[in-house]
A protein has these predicted regions:
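Ser/Thr/Gly/Pro-rich low-complexity, disordered linker/stalk segments of secreted
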Residues: 8-18
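Predominantly soluble domains enriched in secretory-pathway, periplasmic, or organellar proteins
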Residues: 19-23, 27-31, 36-507
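N-terminal pro-sequences and low-complexity stem/linker regions of secreted or lumenal proteins
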Residues: 475-914
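Acidic side chains
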Residues: 9, 149, 238, 256, ...
């Protein structure tokens, strides 16, 4: 097969709209001409030989004269250059991948049970008159319910007395209630309310299938038949009724909770919309006349009359802010609701039938703190909420004698990474659960997403107990939280000095002084799934581990990643850059939104990861797509449009739901090769890059901000009909070089910045921290041959965007991020990047008969375009790159194949309906 010859007319730009077709990723490769001669992109021809639209500037191929430097930036030092992990100067402090510090108040224990890999503590339920706290542990790996002894939190003893496991595809949700003294009911996606027996004398949990309550057939996110996915559970004050709400179903169920009628459906009500989050009875009303439900679809708190269980009905509703979450009853009149994406509390007056919004922090106007769970302590008149995005819990003193109640900020307490639940115990101490624990540490080989092994990529949550905090504790805690989150203010952050008075620095030190005088085009290129050490671990001047590069030798690394590594040596990189994602669905949230959010952290593994296919829409992931999965400030595309920055999107699934035009410029390219979304991992990136090159050099119609995906380096593993990992990486690298060559040989090169990174670190190990990933800065205005040591992350890249264009920050996470000023220089070097065509030969994977083990693993996967839903792919790519294929199916590979089987069944709903 020859590369398709597209006839181009040197006088007709329209002939460049469709790039030549590539056969590089077609199997078998024997008939592909590109196996001997690399792909040729016509848009890379000499500028004066190309036709140009009238939008193109006159250009002679040269560069402006270089003027002497007027401003300089200092190199980062001190706290600003510390790598993720334990702080070497403070044993009580952990540095997260995003640069924030974790300094938990009180006592902390993390749940490191080895057979609960990938756990995330979703919620907590104190057991009355005891020291026990029950925890729902969900996440990527095995789900579980844990019995935790609060007296052992922070000690050398394991606080987990017992637990019950729910392996995939069983799926738990956060809601849990205690019926009587010994029956625990837990929300699930299994078509039942899961039941357990709890012995408070020993702390023993046992599964009790006989008491699990079957639920009626329901629907999934596509409105197909599916198990009921429970969101809210509420037990009436007299213990006679159980209310159940759903993530996808609009019905509210009232079930019999008495021994005589256990589990019988008494009635149902149709709610205005779904999803719901929490259901709760008012403890101030012993009659249990009403149950209250946070309904996120319409942003409401619902009041449902369940006094007649056979005919429950919605009686009232009150408007809230976006994504109402937790509920707390202040007294018989007032209810508080936490609004996650709204960053507000809603105070509901049931007497006056009104609602009042209160900001979580009146001094902050940006989104990102994310109040979720609520707890009200009546004796102290204190209201508490988890601030998931700030790694904190906040407290207010409440005066209900005023209308509305006066909420006076009492302070905050720092927590570990991503708090999820809060409760005030009878002695006034505060219990807090968290999902992401202390970060994940190093990985000497391959990063396994859900490993519970503390030596290999741990991902686990935990529990925190803070003795009854004083006013001074809360004040000090608020100061600590502010310090922990202000990454950009760390000691040793770079600064810009202009000794001659005139500020000509290309990256303005603030975003309020107008746009950059030198950079007006930014290109953000997102590739797939590599750690820093995997691609750059052998780079001179970088903190790398050569033993962890994907290929064993520098010669092979330079040949396979020819253009990326060439650009890394010519321009600037950082060896202290991170994404806080584990997999692609999170990674694209970070690249598109500049932050993560509670919906993302709780839902990413429900889209196929770990064998759970709860969100089953094959066209999209819920994060960044569905209304309840999009933060209030919107995506980077909404941000650019709101600030009148013309932009283009060359393939991305997230954030495109709105993607408004700017000045009539249509940002979405439906005709981009491989499609406008994230799909078609196996479509040759060289076509994508050549298409984009034509828009840069022939049509000259790119916006000031360009977002583009080049996903081939994700690879499709080792299969008999798929390209080898090396072939896909080589084609991806070729495309990277084509793109850089196009930009740097164009009139806009003199004012351009290209940022290239990976969406997540799923392939390869890293000796510093699992989330460390490569980032490359290409521009005349960056220091050439430079390795930055400043700790930065994806939100830092978005902060660069804000400063280049002189626009407001999109959210608080970006506002607080580090700004890598040291990467830039006032003395430009206009030397362009010259693409070197691919040298690595094309090849396809192995026949299963050649390697039964690797063939069996890859054959177990479903659609490889369902990104990252191939258990074991990262491990397999590592083995293939290192020439160490498995000779037999290992226990780990068998678990991965079993997980794949569950995923494939889930896609056709076999495991969705009982």
């Amino acid at each position: 097969m020859q590369q398709q010859a597209i006839v181009v007319d040197a006088g007709d730009p329209s002939t460049f709209k469709e790039p030549p077709k590539s056969c590089a990723l077609t199997c078998p490769v024997s008939g592909c001409a590109e196996n001997g001669a690399p792909y040729v992109c016509p848009a890379l021809a000499a500028w004066d030989s190309l036709p140009h639209e009238s939008t193109c500037a006159d250009w002679d191929g040269g560069a402006p004269a270089v003027e002497a430097t007027k401003c300089t930036a200092t190199a980062a030092s001190g706290d600003a250059v510390k790598y993720a992990g334990p702080d070497p100067d403070d044993a009580t402090k952990v540095i997260l991948p995003d640069g924030r510090r974790v300094t938990p108040a009180g006592s902390i224990s993390y749940f490191r049970e080895m057979d609960l890999e990938g756990g995330e503590a979703y919620s907590l339920l104190p057991v009355p008159s005891s020291n026990w706290i029950l925890v729902v542990d969900a996440g990527y790996g095995v789900h579980a319910v844990l019995a935790v002894d609060r007296t052992k939190i922070g000690t050398s003893s394991d606080p987990v007395a017992s637990y019950v496991k729910y392996p995939a595809p069983k799926t738990l949700n956060s809601a849990a209630v205690l019926v009587g003294t010994s029956t625990v009911l837990v929300a699930s996606d299994d078509g039942v309310v899961e039941a357990l027996d709890f012995d408070a004398t020993k702390g023993t949990l046992t599964e009790d299938d006989a008491k699990s309550i079957p639920l009626p057939e329901s629907v999934d996110d596509n409105n197909n038949k599916a198990n009921w996915y429970v969101s809210g559970l509420a037990l009436s004050p007299d213990g006679s009724k159980l209310v159940v709400t759903s993530v996808f179903d609009k019905r509210l169920l009232v079930l019999d909770a008495t021994q005589a009628g256990w589990g019988k459906q008494l009635g149902s009500a149709t709610l205005p919309n779904a999803p719901t989050q929490q259901a709760a009875f008012d403890p101030n009303d012993a009659t249990g006349h009403f149950v209250y439900v946070t309904e996120q679809g319409d942003r409401k708190l619902l009041e449902v009359d369940v006094s007649n269980a056979a005919a429950p009905a919605v009686t009232r509703s009150w408007g809230t802010d976006k994504n109402p979450w937790g509920i707390a009853f202040l007294d018989a009149r007032w209810i508080a609701v936490a609004n996650d994406f709204g960053d507000t509390l809603t105070l509901v007056d049931r007497t006056a039938n009104s609602a009042t919004a209160v900001p979580v922090d009146s001094a902050v106007t940006l989104h990102g703190e994310e109040p979720t769970a609520l707890a009200f302590d009546a004796p102290s008149h204190m209201l508490w909420t988890t601030l998931a995005g700030a790694n904190a819990v906040a407290a207010w003193t409440v005066d209900t004698s005023q209308t509305p109640p006066a909420l006076s900020p009492a302070g905050r307490l720092p927590t570990p990474w991503w708090p999820t639940g809060v409760a005030v115990l009878p002695d006034g101490s505060v219990a807090i659960s968290n999902m992401r624990g202390p970060s994940s540490g190093t990985d000497p080989t391959q990063y396994p997403i859900g490993s519970g092994n503390p030596d290999r990529g741990p991902m686990f949550g935990g529990m925190q107990i803070v003795a009854k905090p004083s006013a001074a504790d809360l004040s000090a805690g608020a100061a600590a939280v502010a310090t922990n989150d202000q990454v950009g203010a760390l000691a040793g952050a770079p600064t810009v000095t202009c000794p001659h008075g005139e500020n000509d620095f290309p990256l303005p030190p603030t975003n309020t002084q107008g746009p950059s005088k030198h950079i007006d085009h930014v290109f953000f290129i997102v590739r797939e799934n590599k750690t820093f050490d995997a691609l750059l671990g052998d780079f001179k001047g970088a903190n790398g581990a050569p033993s962890l590069t994907m290929k064993a030798s520098t010669v092979d690394m330079d040949k396979l990643w020819l253009d990326f590594r060439k650009a890394g040596r010519q321009f600037a990189i950082s060896d202290n850059y991170y994404t806080s994602a584990e997999v692609s669905v999170q990674g694209h949230v970070w690249t598109v939104f500049g932050r993560s959010f509670d919906f993302d952290e709780r839902a990413w593994f429900l889209t196929g990861y770990g064998g759970r296919q709860v969100y089953d829409n094959p066209a999209s992931q819920p994060q960044g797509i569905i209304p309840t999965g999009r933060p209030a400030e919107g995506s980077v595309f909404d941000w650019m449009a709101a600030n009148h920055v013309e932009y283009d999107v060359y393939s991305e699934g997230l954030g495109l739901i709105s993607a408004p035009m700017v000045n009539g410029h249509n940002p979405v390219h439906l005709d981009v090769p491989g499609g406008p979304t994230q799909g078609q991992i196996g479509y040759p990136d060289v076509e994508r890059a050549c298409y984009e090159a034509a828009h840069v050099r022939v049509f000259c119609d790119v916006g000031n901000f360009v977002y583009a995906l080049l996903p081939n380096d994700h690879t499709e593993g080792v299969g008999m009909s798929t390209p080898s990992p090396e072939a896909m990486v080589a084609v991806n690298d070729d495309a990277t070089g084509i793109f850089l060559d196009a930009v740097s040989h164009s009139p806009i090169w003199k004012s351009s910045l290209v940022v290239i990174t990976e969406d997540d670190p799923a392939d390869g190990g890293d000796h510093v921290e699992n989330h460390r990933t490569p980032v490359l800065f290409v521009s005349p205005w960056v220091k050439h041959g430079y390795v930055s040591k400043q700790h930065v992350d994806v939100s830092s890249v978005h902060k660069i965007f804000a400063h280049v264009f002189g626009i407001p920050y999109p959210n608080e996470i970006v506002a607080n991020a580090a700004l890598p000023l040291d990467l830039f220089t006032s003395t430009p070097d206009y030397t362009p990047f010259t693409h070197e065509p691919r040298q690595w030969p094309l090849s396809c994977g192995v026949e299963p008969s050649v390697n039964l083990a690797e063939g069996a693993l890859s054959a177990s996967w479903g659609d490889v375009d369902d990104v990252d839903e191939q258990p074991g792919l990262g491990d397999q790519v590592w083995r293939a790159m290192r020439g160490l294929p498995a000779t037999a199916v290992t226990p780990t590979m068998q678990r991965q194949m079993d997980e794949s089987a569950r995923l494939v069944r889930g896609r056709v709903h076999v495991n969705h309906v009982k």
